[in-house]
Amino acid sequence: PGSGASNAAGGGGAGAAGNNSSPPNTAGSGGNGRANNITGSCVTYAGGGGGGSDSNAPQTTPGGTGGGGAGGNGAVGTAGTANLGGGGGGGGRGPSCAQNAGGAGGSGVVIARAPGTSGVVFSSSPGCVADISLASDRGQIAKFTASGTLNISDAGAGIPMSYLIIAGGGGGGTGAGAAAEGAGGGGAGGYRVSFNCETSGGGSSSESELFVSAGAYTITVGGGGNGATNNCGANGSAGSPSSLSGITSIGGGYGGGDGQNGGPGGS
């Protein structure tokens, strides 16, 4: 996650670290996320939030690809995108603290995929926010945008299941008054994947598939951290973790407020 400075740093993404500010008045952009096609469509997740800058900056500072929120240009930071795990943008440097609040982090997502040869059947418990679909190889895909239960039937002696687990992004910090500093962008939510030999966030190696049998599996989808509000120089809040059957992705770190360091997190 980014730290607060006159023009602040961006939060880290799953694919790259956040960028530092550059003179004379440009804040650092958020680190880019990582692309993944576990659903059959290529989607980029877990971008870091942009750092906040003063109103003399040439433009707002972008968040990283994958849902990172833009940093405020003498204004409020933009929220990270829901269900992509993006970090919130840092608040800018401007006339009042209330006008320089940080953006909230985006919520995470959990996606599971079974091979087409398995004959497995996915379903979700009533009331769960889940999308069950067929892949091109006739495999089953379950996408959870909120916490719930994944029910697996007809799995025989057990099957290998691929997954993508994105945690909630961290919230951006609050900037301060006209004579002070902008705030850092929030870090992206943690990114863990076992699909198609792709690497996890932060350059980690590809993870093993999860071997599952018939039964009910608890899914937790982490919420994004709150952006800091009103209090000058306040830090944002860290994102919440996401998990699937004991495999946990850590929430994104908070963005540092005016003059503060950001917190550690999943990306």
PLM regions: where:
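Low-complexity, glycine/proline-biased repetitive segments and flexible coils/loops
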Residues: 1-267
